[in-house]
């Protein structure tokens, strides 16, 4: 690739988190870079070393991130390149906030580019999985069929006892509704079993031969009612909140250009390249996104799979939240946030609260606007409380999410 000519200005997309200090969570102030390559505010690093929270026995001047460092205290110098970037970012942010609306973009960029979803499974794999599922259904139906004779004999015995104990001369006719129902059910099970076995044979033939056409696979799946999206896991709603469970969807208007969403708008991924979405004041300048659904009353519950994201935040925010601020750093947003080992925290009313538990694989979010309550749970077989706070907003609240923008491929998924 040809290099840019000297003096050529190359646009670079930066967010506050790209130039922030992991210690104070703010923009770098007098940035200094350690030999390992990690940068921090000079004073933040000094204070941390003095408090001995970053050091280890063998290396008291360790980097707070990678825990590497020299045995002797290093001389800290200002990083002029980083300082220049921070100054330019701060000035650009002020101009963007106070300046006029930018000129209209070309029409070709007015519509967000549909996110490309990578196909992870071949048709053969899908057919093989369907074959296994149908096989399980066949076993279930056969099991039910074997249980029918015992049920029938139990029914006959019960009818016989009733007949002997009855003081009247009433008898159960051969066309008793109970007996007719049993006969019809038995016939229906046999029909279902025959249909399933035919489908099973067809699927097995497709696996051993060439890949079945997509339309044929869809028709076979539809005939037995097997229509789950193989890419997305089945939702695990905590039983305590099942009556209020929802599956909100991401709002494309607020979606950062660093992010992409899946076709069903329930998975958000850190993009490997900046997306050419149409610019508007509703779009986040950092790696965040809101959901389309807004809540101003009642109770709602949803779950988020965080297993495939190294740094994330999950919470709620009003639509009017500033688009250059992170969740929890405004008066109208609340969240829990995971930034790596020993960096699990909650943010409410612009205040940080450290959380002692480890990162949850699935986060359950309970929003009770009648009581003004927001609670987060770690969801496995049952929900375990993580954090609870009060919420108060004059505007409806939306589910809100943040992903670390420098880890392409990381994603969060609403279950």
Swiss-Prot record:
The keyword Zinc-finger applies. It comes from the Eukaryota. One of its GO terms (biological process) is protein polyubiquitination. Pathway: Protein modification; protein ubiquitination. Its main location: cytoplasm. Residues 228-415 form the B30.2/SPRY domain. InterPro entries: B30.2/SPRY, B30.2/SPRY_sf, Butyrophylin_SPRY, ConA-like_dom_sf, E3_ubiq-ligase_TRIM/RNF, PRY, RNF135_SPRY_PRY_dom, SPRY_dom. It is an enzyme of class 2 (transferase). Keywords: Coiled coil, Cytoplasm, Immunity, Innate immunity, Metal-binding, Transferase, Ubl conjugation pathway, Zinc, Zinc-finger. GO terms for cellular component: cytoplasm; cytoplasmic stress granule; ribonucleoprotein complex. It holds the Pfam family zf-C3HC4_4. It is found in: Cytoplasm; Cytoplasm, Stress granule. The B30.2/SPRY domain mediates the interaction with the substrate RIGI. The coiled-coil domains mediate homodimerization and the bridging of viral RNA-associated RIGI filaments. Homodimer. Interacts (homodimer) with RIGI (double-stranded RNA-bound oligomeric form); involved in both RIGI ubiquitination, oligomerization into filaments associated with viral RNAs and the bridging of these filaments. Interacts with UBE2D3 and UBE2N; E2 ubiquitin ligases involved in RNF135-mediated ubiquitination of RIGI and activation of the RIG-I signaling pathway. Interacts with PCBP2. This is E3 ubiquitin-protein ligase RNF135. It comes from Rattus norvegicus (Rat).
